[in-house]
């Protein structure tokens, strides 16, 4: 997402768009039709008018700090009937729109470490014939692994229209979800606790709960699809290469995610200066705690002290610190406090081969994969760049339309290549025949308040989610993002996407959708000139169609070098450098050789990287 210092009008627009598919805060009443018994006891849910739902079911517990940076404790059995009528605790994070915190608390530390809850939605005919169990789709939310929660999106329309069961899960975030310090992991009693990828371990624990219990809700435990967007997509990819997750799911959907793991060496090292394209360091977090506790006067003395403290002293410091102290230390050690935390190859949960290496080596070979990105992913993240946008009467304006679209195109193409095209091509060449790829191109936003939303946002990051969930709040959307003119086509496109997603969940192949009447979505074919992926767009922009186009590293660099929409060659150098530094597209020497050595005499640190270090305000 992007910063709260973004213009008020854009906040309203985006909040309305994203919140259109969120779950209204309503007091739900018990429905006796939802009374059932699961492994820990009896439970009752509610009827939201469209589906049955059971909210706030605890699948694991973090009862105190002794369980911090460990697998969650098993939940206890209960007496009586558990009322699953409201969502469970939010995991610790900064208050924001995407964790449904009240606006006055945006930027505050909110939530609880004891947050391992999930929610279940089922069609209202689910108990009519329990011999006909339904496919299960487990949603892993996004938010850079530092924010978000399971109650932000409402899957009721997907559930009711496509006859599937959806489970959404919370998982630990930020320094509680991804943290690897030698003095914590060295005394761990099992491989999971040694991992450091605790947010991914939470997902595995939730999937184990699904295997034990989903049949009580009418679901098929032998037909589970995991799907997630952004960081949730990264976490889906990590689960594909985690041996502990083997057999817990049978299909996987990665929406605007990626496969590049985090840097385990960086996470455990001392860093005199954090880099904006890296995640935080556990060593530096401890340094900050030592300063906060007045055990050291500054960072350098803290590093010296840390080296001389025993393992037990370091662990005691970390476990005795309050939730707020841990999080404040974490925020203080990051250049960009909303930079995404990626699962790292710890050798316990995630193989040292990484995600792609694990898949290419044959692990989880039989799991069909759907993977895709949005055409204009990066527009959402570029909005806060004052060199590309300006503010006029509190309304964002594009400074140079050609440059804006060009920068977004090349940065978004880099994402697509690394997250979709490269892994799909490599996996299918290695023998996989069940990789299905897409690109979401819908960009029919109207012009509102003088803002050209079609160009400003287009098919931006996360904008496909309401189409997949199918829940559009017409009052909010027609006022800000959608219009009465395009609403009918939006709903038609959404219905098609839900149908493809559901058919994939049923049979592992999106095919022609549930009704068999849509464009045939074929698997990625690595052959030259063969169809590769499907495009989702409005009818007047080409509609739903297959294409044989795909990206390579060489093509990306050539497209950038020959783009006449970018007049200043320094922008081309910066775009390539960003792809190298942030995305690991290629090696640094490629920048020096780029476009007849145009960039070789430039110093990235003074020409453009200085802008990357600017302190970011809280993203909402």
Which residues are covered by each model-predicted region?
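Mobile gating loops/cap/lid regions near enzyme active sites that modulate substrate access
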Residues: 383, 425, 429-620
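Hydrophobic h-region of N-terminal signal peptides that target proteins for export
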Residues: 14-22
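Serine-hydrolase-like catalytic core of hydrolytic proteins
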Residues: 56, 98-308, 348-351, 356-384, ...
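Sec-dependent signal peptide recognition
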Residues: 5-12
